[in-house]
Structure formats: C-alpha cells, structure tokens
C-alpha cells in the first residue's frame, strides 16, 4: 500500500492594501518573494511531501484546501489576516505554524494563534519542526540557534510560485541584517546587528542557474560588510547582468566601492533617506544621513547610470504640517528617480514603539493598520488626520503628470523601467484615498474578525 504524501501548505498573507482580491492593484506589480521558495526548499528530503504555496498578493486562499499542516510567514501588517486564517484552519483541525518578522518581534502575540511558532530565521528550525511533526512530537515553539549562519542550505525553489504572475522571479539574497540601529527599524530589533552572509559562490551559482540577465537583490543593506560586498560585486561582474538592490547613503562616500557597484552592473538602488530634517535623523539614530548631501548622492549615482529610489517617512517628532510638500518638492528638485513616502510606523518590539508607549502616544494595536500608510500613533506636532492626508498629498504632488514626465527625461533608469515604475506609483498615489479612513481611530482595539464559513459555495477566504 502506497504511503500518503504529507500535505504542506505555505501561505504569505496580505493586508487589505495589497491583497489580490480588493487590494489597490488589479494585478501584482511585485517581484517574487523569496520566503516561500526558501521554506519549500528546506523541507527535508526524507519527508515525502506535497508542497502548495499561496501568495495572497497574487491569488486567493481556498477555505476548503486539504492540508496536514499550514505554515504562514507574518509581518506586522499581515498579522491580523494571518490570525484570521489560522483560526479558520485550526477550527478544521489543521495544525498551523507561524513565523516571520512579527512572530520574532512579539512571539507572545502570535503564540495563542498557532500550534507552533518559529522565532528567528527558519533555516535550521523549520526542517527540525517538520521532522518533529512527521514523528508526532511537534513542539509549541522553535527558536533560532545561537550559532546560526547562512552557509550550506539549498537554493530557493522558485518553481513553487507562478513566475508569470510577478514582475520578475529573478530575486536573490546575499546577506541578512544591518549594522545600523535606526529607531524605527524592525531589523535590529528582530535579528540584531550582526550581518549573516551567504557564500559568494552560492550567489553566483544561483544567478547562473536562473540564467538571469536582470536581478533584484533584496538584502536590506548590501554594504553592511564592505569587504564581503566588494567580493560579491567582483564575482558578479563577469556575468554582465543588470541588477537592483538596497544600500545606505554611506555608499556614495566610498567612491572606489561605488565605482565597483556601477561596474558590476547596478542600475538602481533603494536608499532610506527618511527625512530632510537633521534633527529627525539624529533622533532616529540615522545621523549618518545628511540631507544637504542628498543632491550630491543623486548626482554621483546618475553619473554612473544608477537610478535612486529615495524613501521618506513622515510623522517624526520634528515634522510639522508643512513637511509633506517641502519633502515632495525636495524629491522632485533633487531629481530622485523614484520618490516613495510612508507614515513612520512604530512596529512592536522596536525602540520607537517602546518610546511612544512610554509617552502614551500609541493609539492602536490593530496590526492591520501597521502597513506604513496608516497612522497608529499620536504625532507630536500635527493631528492624525493631517499626517494621513499629508502623506497622500506628497504622493500626489510627486506623481503628478508634469513631475512624472520630467523624471522620465532625466532618470538614470532604463527608459522602460522608469516609465513602468513611475506610472505604477502614480496609479498607487491616486488610489490611496480608497484605503484611508480615520474613523477606525475611535476604536483603537482590534476588532475580532467574523468566523469564516467553509462551504462549497464560498470556497475563497476573503
């Protein structure tokens, strides 16, 4: 008699803003995430399993799905959705495992909603959990080992997600963590400041296996370890790829490294500029940013045909109602190729959250609103609604037709990339108001979701 395969379902939940059904985009403009392909590749070979992966950004979750185990990766903005899905599957006697940044930041919040949680990176603990589950002894919690490193693990299995539903599947990761300690950042709060690095040859092998001509590196700070970064850039130069990634503004102070970045094929970088106020930056422990140097940073990148996605946050303590248009105008005048704006979010477990909690300024613990576009705390020098509407105004100013057309003329990005990204962000800017509603502030406590009825006529969990 043939033994039945273990049915494992891996889900990446999404909040209302980015969900496939009812979200801001009719189709995904995202690149393929690496979490689900990584988790799928980590399933031990000795476990005969059928793995199903569902990304709610591109598809629906079937309420009647058949599975022996459901695993979900959770960020704070998707926690309420993850808990809703977990309650549904557990009501059907399907065990649920939760992991990811939110679970690592506040495991005590996630534990009641799951049969087991994984705290920290999953490379060691996810396979151990699966072996325990197969043997009937799954524990309630698995913690990342102290001697964790990123060597010796299988490459992500990108076949578990439909490539054609993403802008690209050529997504790669060389390192994790960041050496800085910015007050509002999740990374040092969840995983510390020690960079974890994959062997450079493993990255080269993955790029070759994917036959990538263009690539996105999702490392939060590619230059956390400059020596390692230089080795990586030297190694990928012969591949003659175009690549995009993330770095800090400090890269532009290191001209030899910046030249190597350009020579290796970099065509675009995301940098957290955050604010045009030096006092804001100092308070946020990001004093290495200097707004007076931002135009120089843009110029140095453009000289090397590297485009800049510059990210700003609003709601820091020095911000007044004038900051929104000041920042948007600055972004346009500085010729930033792709400005991006967000409401500063005090994610649980971060130093910012602890400070605002002490000051009595946290207004909501409805995790669904912790998405970078909703206000969940009391700003110091403006109202909640001013912060909410001002952020929307900055988006609309920066992505007016006149400013989009101006950017297309000077952008360092390839023309088709500049056109696609600017039109996508213009679309986003003009639909944000659909998701802005300050009425929820009158009820800051989390509303419990209604039970989901699993019936043949309603097989999609909305």
Task: Give the positions of each predicted feature.
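Structural recognition of alpha->loop->beta junctions
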Residues: 109-128, 260-270, 326-341
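Radical SAM enzyme core and accessory elements
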Residues: 2-10, 17, 48-53, 65-68, ...
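Radical SAM [4Fe-4S] cluster-binding motif and immediate context
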Residues: 155-309, 316, 322-329
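A structural motif corresponding to the C-terminal end of an alpha-helix
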Residues: 39-50, 210, 297-308, 334, ...
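Acidic, low-complexity intrinsically disordered segments
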Residues: 2-210, 214
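Alpha-helical structural signal in soluble globular domains
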Residues: 42-46, 88, 92, 109, ...
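Short, electropositive alpha-helical surface patch
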Residues: 62, 67-76, 230-236, 240, ...
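Flexible glycine/acidic-rich beta-alpha junction loops that bind and position SAM and/or redox cofactors
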Residues: 13-20, 108-109, 180, 227, ...
């Amino acid at each position: 008699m043939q033994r039945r395969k273990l049915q494992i379902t891996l889900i990446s939940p999404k909040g209302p803003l980015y969900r496939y059904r009812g979200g801001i985009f009719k189709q995904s403009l995202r690149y393929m995430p690496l979490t689900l392909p990584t988790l799928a590749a980590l399933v031990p070979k000795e476990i005969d399993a059928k793995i199903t992966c569902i990304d709610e950004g591109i598809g629906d979750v079937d309420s009647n799905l058949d599975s022996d185990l459901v695993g979900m990766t959770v960020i704070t903005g998707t926690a309420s959705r993850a808990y809703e899905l977990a309650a549904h599957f557990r009501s059907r006697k399907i065990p649920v495992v939760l992991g990811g940044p939110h679970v690592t930041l506040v495991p005590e919040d996630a534990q009641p909603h799951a049969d087991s949680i994984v705290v920290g990176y999953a490379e060691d603990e996810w396979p151990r959990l699966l072996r325990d589950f197969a043997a009937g002894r799954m524990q309630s919690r698995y913690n990342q080992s102290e001697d964790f490193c990123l060597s010796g693990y299988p490459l992500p299995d990108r076949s578990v997600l439909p490539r054609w539903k993403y802008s690209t599947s050529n997504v790669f990761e060389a390192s994790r963590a960041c050496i800085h300690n910015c007050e509002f950042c999740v990374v040092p709060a969840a995983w510390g400041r020690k960079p974890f690095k994959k062997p450079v040859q493993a990255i080269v092998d993955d790029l070759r296996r994917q036959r990538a001509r263009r690539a996105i590196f999702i490392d939060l700070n590619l230059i956390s370890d400059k020596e390692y970064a230089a080795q990586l850039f030297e190694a990928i130069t012969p591949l003659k790829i175009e690549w995009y990634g993330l770095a800090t503004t400090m890269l532009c102070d290191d001209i030899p490294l910046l030249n190597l970045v350009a020579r290796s094929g970099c065509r675009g970088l995301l940098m957290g500029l955050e604010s045009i106020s030096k006092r804001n930056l100092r308070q946020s422990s990001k004093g290495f940013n200097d707004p007076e140097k931002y135009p120089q940073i843009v110029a140095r990148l453009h000289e090397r045909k590297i485009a800049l996605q510059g990210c700003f946050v609003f709601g820091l303590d020095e911000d007044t109602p004038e900051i929104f248009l000041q920042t948007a105008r600055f972004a346009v005048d500085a010729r930033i190729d792709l400005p991006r704006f967000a409401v500063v979010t005090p994610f649980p477990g971060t130093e910012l959250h602890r400070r605002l909690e002490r000051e009595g300024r946290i207004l909501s613990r409805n995790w669904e609103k912790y998405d970078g576009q909703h206000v969940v705390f009391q700003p110091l020098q403006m109202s909640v609604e001013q912060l909410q509407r001002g952020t929307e105004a900055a988006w609309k100013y920066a992505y007016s037709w006149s400013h989009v057309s101006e950017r297309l003329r000077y952008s360092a990005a390839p023309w088709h990339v500049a056109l696609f990204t600017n039109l996508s962000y213009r679309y986003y800017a003009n639909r944000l108001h659909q998701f802005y509603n300050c009425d929820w502030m009158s009820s800051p406590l989390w509303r419990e979701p209604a039970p989901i009825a699993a019936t043949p006529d309603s097989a999609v969990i909305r």
